[in-house]
Amino acid sequence: MLIHAQGVDSESFFKVMPKLAKKYHVYAVDCYGHGGSLHDASKYNVVDIGNAVIDFIQNEIEKPVSLLGHSSGGLIAAYVASHSNLCRNLILEDPPFFSSQGERRKSTFNFVDLSTVCHEFLTQTETSDFVLYYFSHQYAWNFFPEKSREKIREKMIGMAAKFRQKNPDENLRVPFWPKAALAGFQGMNRYDPRFGEAFYTDSFHAGILHEELLRNIHCRTMFMKAKADVSSDGILLGALGEGDLHQVLEALPDCRLIRFDCGHGIHVEKSKEFIRQVEIFR
């Protein structure tokens, strides 16, 4: 069973699903606030989503599963594993343990990027197109050379706006924009920015400490760790740092750690190695 990251939907796994389906019966769900699932801001927390996943496994699959969660989906998967006996194998794909909770969250890429953009979008009235708003205001513009940044930004936003006008129901495509970055727009058409607001306010975690979640996991576990760095102004450019990873492994002493030389979307950027590791862990 696959649980996607925030901002995208279950289709974000389409690149790896055909090969996984050769050895698994694959289930991929849309979390609340994403895709075709319920859009109700009161449900945008790890408890309500986690319990919905537990209910789905109990009533639809009717037996324990191998559960894989990417990013925030990994936090949800950890909740399921720690609050039920329905998880046989747990695979955590670069989830933001410790870094996304409490005051720490304010110094992470997700906070200065998606969370803050969601918050600002919800407080303005000029546009209702969140996809274009996010593209226009994303933190990634800071990575462009300062001298040419605004010129490039203006041109790219113009191309994105034309695409959105002609193809409002399609996933965003912008010429020259990296494919790995565009993968983050998969399903954003049906993303509720109030979900990002839950990470902005820290309400997503419903008061449950990450260490508490991890220490109550007793099934086989594998952690997939992507690259991370820290910017000159102290922003964690990645899901979690080495200190956070150390805390994860302390709480899960029998966890298998696999490192990937890529960005946050491991199943997108390193799909072959991702599939290989999942099959080895079976």
Name what the model sees in each region.
Residues 268-280:
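Post-His helix in hydrolase/transferase enzymes
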Residues 74-85, 90:
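Short glycine-enriched nucleophile-adjacent loop
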Residues 215-261:
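Conserved loop-alpha-helix segment in the C-terminal half of the alpha/beta-hydrolase fold
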Residues 91-150:
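Flexible "cap/lid" loop of the alpha/beta hydrolase fold
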Residues 150-212, 228:
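Hydrophobic, aromatic-rich cap/lid helix
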